[in-house]
């Protein structure tokens, strides 16, 4: 079984590389990758149903390590498709805010999660209950929306491990995208400042009043920004030239 799982993973990795090189849209690539993983999981399921694990330790290893590596990859790409679809055609700043919100939600999923603590600590005392099919307890199943799942290919927490792995992939991916977008936004800001694209054509008195209005209205960081910082940002962003109205 170990060799079968290893070959399955290698095949998936090769297919992903091949698809990534195709000159097609990102969403189409992700859909193709999802199809590949779904087929691989179906073949893995068929192999497991017809296989007799040598001992409980091998079954635990399969459902705690091997299967989640593949099913977690499927969860990752399904969520990635949703994320990429939601951010498509959005401005850089909107994408950045959206991804930061998604990242925060994923990180929150790890809080107050007893199984996550168990898994991350490398504990094994409950593995027989969590990763042996015969010990599956429907009353303990936190994935209540999947109660009709196939008991021949499912344990109490193999999908929990898969979700943890998927979320770890998502955190890495989203963090990288946020860094990339932030760099682009910074370069765009510098370009605007250097090119003097935004020129303040009203009086300087009006500019001062504008800055005070932003400060009084608590328009930045819920009011946790100093007047000096707001003035500095406006001075950097807005090109002011001598005006006869001053």
Where is each model-derived feature located?
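Amphipathic alpha-helical interaction modules
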Residues: 37-56, 217-238
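Intrinsically disordered, low-complexity acidic/Q/S/K-rich activation/interaction tracts characteristic
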Residues: 1-188
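Conserved small/polar residues in nucleotide/adenosyl-binding loops
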Residues: 239-246
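Basic amphipathic recognition helices
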Residues: 189-235
């Amino acid at each position: 079984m170990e060799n079968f799982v290893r070959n399955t993973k290698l095949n998936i990795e090769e297919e992903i590389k091949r698809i990534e090189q195709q000159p097609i849209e990102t969403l189409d690539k992700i859909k193709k990758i999802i199809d590949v993983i779904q087929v691989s999981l179906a073949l893995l399921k068929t192999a497991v149903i017809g296989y007799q694990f040598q001992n409980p330790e091998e079954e635990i290893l399969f459902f705690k390590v091997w299967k989640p590596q593949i099913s977690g990859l499927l969860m990752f790409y399904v969520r990635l498709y949703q994320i990429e679809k939601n951010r498509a055609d959005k401005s850089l700043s909107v994408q950045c805010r959206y991804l930061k919100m998604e990242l925060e939600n994923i990180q929150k999923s790890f809080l107050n999660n007893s199984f996550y603590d168990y898994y991350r600590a490398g504990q094994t005392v409950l593995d027989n209950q969590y990763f042996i099919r015969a010990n599956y307890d429907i009353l303990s199943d936190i994935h209540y929306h999947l109660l009709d799942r196939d008991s021949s290919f499912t344990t109490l927490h193999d999908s929990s491990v898969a979700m943890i792995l998927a979320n770890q992939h998502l955190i890495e991916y989203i963090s990288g995208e946020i860094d990339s977008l932030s760099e682009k936004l910074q370069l765009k800001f510098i370009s605007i400042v250097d090119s003097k694209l935004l020129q303040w054509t009203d009086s300087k008195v009006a500019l001062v009043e504008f800055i005070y209005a932003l400060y009084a209205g608590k328009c930045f960081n819920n009011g946790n920004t100093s007047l000096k910082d707001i003035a500095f940002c406006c001075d950097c962003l807005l090109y002011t030239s001598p005006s006869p109205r001053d």
